[in-house]
């Protein structure tokens, strides 16, 4: 069964725009409900999909953070070209890292980071995550266990330079947190199984933003946008956006 690849989305509403950024191995579906909620509150939302994401995992390994950052910048430019002068950004996981990078690269009204990593995981741990993603993708395609095993063996022979580059990106953004002055809302799931939750404290403590807040979600895991506190998260992000000086 061929999986229909997810698409970027653009929900047009009011003149305030929010760029929504998904995580590594994720896609726009991870931020779609948030996008629909914000649209209902009058915010225009756009979520790009990074190169190599939402497609067979064999394509992921041939892309890297430079490609994905270009997709983020293209998403920002897309909103600018549509006439949106004022743009906020909200990102999940790697998307949160990119949100911070946007914060010291282009004018941004406000930043929401959700479960964004600031600690470097070993390449082995990251690689395990990629293998798990690849296996899950193949299962969703309805392939037999035998075919999946064969394809996974082949997949494991492909070198993944991406992971080293991903580590370097996180380290680089962490080094530049003190260049961020935009209002920032740091969101972190207490039971995050993917990243070190202390990342949230690093972001909160090291950015120079005079207006900043941090909130811990006690019942949520890493993909907080799809977890059981998502409705509360939606309301909190909306309240933060409403507090900005648009």
Curated annotation (Swiss-Prot):
Q: Gene3D superfamilies from the entry?
A: alpha/beta hydrolase
The record's section on Pfam families has: Hydrolase_4
Query: pH dependence, per the record?
Result: Optimum pH is 9.
Query: Which EC class does it fall in?
Result: hydrolase
List of catalytic residues: 93 (nucleophile), 192 (charge relay system), 222 (charge relay system)
Question: What is reported on how temperature governs activity?
Answer: Optimum temperature is 70 degrees Celsius.
Which SUPFAM superfamilies does the protein's record reference? alpha/beta-Hydrolases (SSF53474)
Hydrolase among keywords: yes
Catalyses: a carboxylic ester + H2O = an alcohol + a carboxylate + H(+)
State the oligomer form and interacting partners: Homodimer.
What PANTHER family does the database record attribute to this sequence? PHOSPHOLIPASE-RELATED
The protein depicted here goes by the name: Carboxylesterase
Name the gene that codes for it. Answer: est
């Amino acid at each position: 069964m061929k999986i229909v690849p997810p698409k970027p989305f653009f929900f047009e509403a009011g003149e305030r725009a929010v760029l929504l950024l998904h995580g590594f191995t994720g896609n726009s579906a991870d931020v779609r409900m948030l996008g629909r909620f914000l649209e209902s509150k009058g915010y225009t939302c756009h979520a790009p999909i990074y190169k190599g994401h939402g497609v067979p995992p064999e394509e992921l390994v041939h892309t890297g953070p430079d490609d994905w950052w270009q997709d983020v910048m293209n998403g920002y430019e897309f909103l600018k070209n549509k006439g949106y002068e004022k743009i906020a950004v909200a990102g999940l996981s790697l998307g949160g890292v990119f949100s911070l990078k946007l914060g010291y690269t282009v004018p941004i009204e406000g930043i929401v980071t959700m479960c964004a990593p600031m600690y470097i995981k070993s390449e082995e741990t990251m690689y395990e995550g990629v293998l798990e993603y690849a296996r899950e993708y193949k299962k969703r395609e309805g392939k037999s266990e035998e075919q999946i095993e064969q394809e996974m063996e082949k997949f494991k022979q492909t070198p993944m330079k991406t992971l080293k580059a991903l580590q370097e990106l996180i380290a680089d953004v962490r080094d530049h947190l003190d260049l961020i002055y935009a209002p920032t809302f740091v969101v972190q799931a207490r039971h995050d199984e993917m990243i070190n939750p202390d990342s949230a404290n690093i972001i909160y403590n090291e950015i120079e933003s005079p207006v900043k807040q941090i909130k811990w979600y006690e019942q949520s895991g890493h993909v907080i946008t799809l977890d059981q506190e998502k409705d509360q998260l939606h309301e909190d992000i909306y309240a933060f956006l409403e507090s900005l000086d648009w």
